[in-house]
Amino acid sequence: MDYFTLFGLPARYQIDTQALSLRFQDLQRQYHPDKFANGTQAQQLAAVQQSATINQAWQTLRHPLTRAEYLLSLHGFDLASEQHTVRDTAFLMEQLTLREELDDIEQSKDDVRLESFIKHVQKMFDARLQQMVEQLDNAAWDAAADTVRKLRFLDKLRSSAEQLEEKLLDF
């Protein structure tokens, strides 16, 4: 059973996150291993396995990027374990330039410039995310997979910038 079906949701990117949360809580209560403490060893093991599946499904579907990756996996794109990388040289060059800029910001410890950088990267991420949503809505799986790969780059860059921000604030 796929994760969307487990939570009673349609297999699409845009989901009702409130319904996801409520169903997660219901499933947690229903399959919590403590409820099977007096059951047979097989029942206890099944409850632990079901609980682990529910938790994994929840973690996957609640985050936009992992939800997109999972949806794409249902359509034959295994992005989680693939060796395929972004082939868009302009995008890759832009990423190198942004990484260099982040390094410069770190060297200069310029928190004002860092704040502007983070906002810029967030705008780039949001624009790509919107592009991906449209691609998934239109079942443009190849294009959506490529956009997810690019979003991974931007997500890592954003994370690096936020870590630098914490480092500069602690300094």
From Swiss-Prot:
Tell me one Pfam family matched here.
HSCB_C
Extract one GO cellular component term from the record. Answer: iron-sulfur cluster transfer complex
- UniProt keyword list: Chaperone
Q: Which GO terms describe its biological process?
A: [2Fe-2S] cluster assembly; protein complex oligomerization; protein folding
Instruction: Indicate the segments forming the J domain, all copies.
Output: 2-74
Alphabetical list of InterPro entries matching this protein? DnaJ_domain (IPR001623), HscB (IPR004640), HscB_C_sf (IPR036386), HscB_oligo_C (IPR009073), J_dom_sf (IPR036869)
Q: What CDD domains does the entry give?
A: DnaJ
Among the GO molecular function terms of this UniProt record, one is: protein-folding chaperone binding
Q: Does the keyword Chaperone apply?
A: yes
Q: Membrane: present as a keyword of the record?
A: no
Spell out the family assignment given in the record's similarity comment.
Belongs to the HscB family.
Q: So what does this one do?
A: Co-chaperone involved in the maturation of iron-sulfur cluster-containing proteins. Seems to help targeting proteins to be folded toward HscA.
Indicate the quaternary assembly: Interacts with HscA and stimulates its ATPase activity. Interacts with IscU.
Write the protein's name. Answer: Co-chaperone protein HscB
What gene codes for this chain?
Answer: hscB
